[in-house]
Amino acid sequence: MAVGKNKRMSKGKKGGKKKAVDPFTKKDWYDIKAPSMFSVRNIGKTLVSRTQGTKIASDGLKGRIFEISLADLNNDEDQSFRKMKLKCEDVQGKNVLTNFAGMDFTTDKIRSLVRKWFSLIECFVDVKTTDGYTLRVFCIGFTKRRMDQAKRTCYAQSAQIRKIRAKMVEIITRECTTCDLKELVLKFIPEVIGKEIEKSCAGIYPLQNVYIRKVKILKAPKFDLTKLMEVHGDYSGEAVGEAVARPVEEKAEETAEAAE
């Protein structure tokens, strides 16, 4: 039996083994800056590929949306159920300047509010702020037991629900159309609108847990750098980290070691 040459076995692979390249060597870190309406301005870092040819790094960052808990933005754990969306509007040096791009509730918070034997009332309304932003604002509220009530259930009648919903739309429209986006965000954080709805609807049916649960930006005005800088104020002088004071004992030990 003739032993032939097996062509498939003798053929070697074309080219040597490719060297593994770490993709992070071609990327840069940028600091994310929150608007001045929040107490914490340095909220984190983001990665982007370096400028290469016609591909500019800042173009890859613009339009990027970051979702951050309000608890981290304001150093307040009581506000952890609110999620804020911040959109990258401009890049200056290694700083990413963001602006408000929406708000939402965490799923567990919404589920904790919904209970049996109470009526749930929801509405949404499209509003336009004084600086040209068109927003869709979603509101949620629940009926509440009266002080002298013996009945177990707290169901509102259909006519009462319609009146409450109309009142919600009226208050949201009034509060949102008389201020700019920055002032409006400052109203959302302490739930000014929700408290106003509770107070106004007390005569129709007592309400509890009234919240602006979601805000969507439908249309934004043309980008203006001057307005963005007004929202951010002066961020250049801020330190990224906090200085930590070293104990005197450690310094004394180091000096003694150096002398030896």
From Swiss-Prot:
Give the chief site where it resides: cytoplasm
User: Which Gene Ontology CC terms are recorded?
Assistant: cytosolic small ribosomal subunit
Q: Which subcellular locations apply to this protein?
A: Cytoplasm
Its domain of life reads: Eukaryota
InterPro entries noted in UniProt? Ribosomal_eS1, Ribosomal_eS1_CS, Ribosomal_eS1_euk
What PANTHER family does its record include? 40S RIBOSOMAL PROTEIN S3A
**Subunit note:** Component of the small ribosomal subunit. Mature ribosomes consist of a small (40S) and a large (60S) subunit. The 40S subunit contains about 33 different proteins and 1 molecule of RNA (18S). The 60S subunit contains about 49 different proteins and 3 molecules of RNA (25S, 5.8S and 5S).
Q: Name the family.
A: Belongs to the eukaryotic ribosomal protein eS1 family.
Specify the protein name: Small ribosomal subunit protein eS1
